[in-house]
Amino acid sequence: MTDANGAPAEAAPQIRMQVLAQYVRDMSFENMVAQKGLQGGDVQPDIQVQVSLDARKRSVEHQYEVITKFKVTSKNKSGSAETLFLLELDYGGIFHVENVPEDQLHPFLLIECPRLLFPFVRRIISDVTRDGGFPPLNVDTVDFLALYRMELARRAEAQKAAQPVQ
């Protein structure tokens, strides 16, 4: 592309992102029915997955920590509706991010970074549920863009509700 004088237009610097580390920050798995066992086909699980995200700047320039928090609850749909298991997982990543405009950094960190972490989160959840005595749970893909938009709408609503009526 050229400008009006025929000189090449200066290209915007290319966004650079590098995953420096990934780790389980915190994890808990509670098997509520371990003593009872899961004999028979009378168990119909109702799986609920809650996802939240957090990002913060680190002391090193261009480095950010992004944490994905998953809370997975399985209840028995039939009969008593007792909780079968509860899994809580905080999975983090350290990212080196450069050349992202300041006004786009927050959505970038809370959409693109969790997208890269998600396959590892899914694998951990699958392995832990299997190792906990249940069939492996393959969590559906999370739409992090929709999750980000819902959080923005929730914050806007909360801010609107907090403003005094004139």
From Swiss-Prot:
BP-aspect Gene Ontology terms: protein folding; protein tetramerization; protein transport
Stated role: One of the proteins required for the normal export of preproteins out of the cell cytoplasm. It is a molecular chaperone that binds to a subset of precursor proteins, maintaining them in a translocation-competent state. It also specifically binds to its receptor SecA.
Protein's name in the database: Protein-export protein SecB
Gene3D superfamilies associated with the record: SecB-like (3.10.420.10)
GO cellular component: cytoplasm
Gene that this polypeptide is encoded by: secB
GO MF annotations in UniProt: unfolded protein binding
Pfam families membership: SecB
Predominant location: cytoplasm
Family per similarity comment: Belongs to the SecB family.
Summary of subunit composition and partner proteins: Homotetramer, a dimer of dimers. One homotetramer interacts with 1 SecA dimer.
Organism: Cereibacter sphaeroides (strain ATCC 17023 / DSM 158 / JCM 6121 / CCUG 31486 / LMG 2827 / NBRC 12203 / NCIMB 8253 / ATH 2.4.1.) (Rhodobacter sphaeroides)
Compartments where located: Cytoplasm
UniProt entry keywords in alphabetical sequence: Chaperone, Cytoplasm, Protein transport, Translocation, Transport
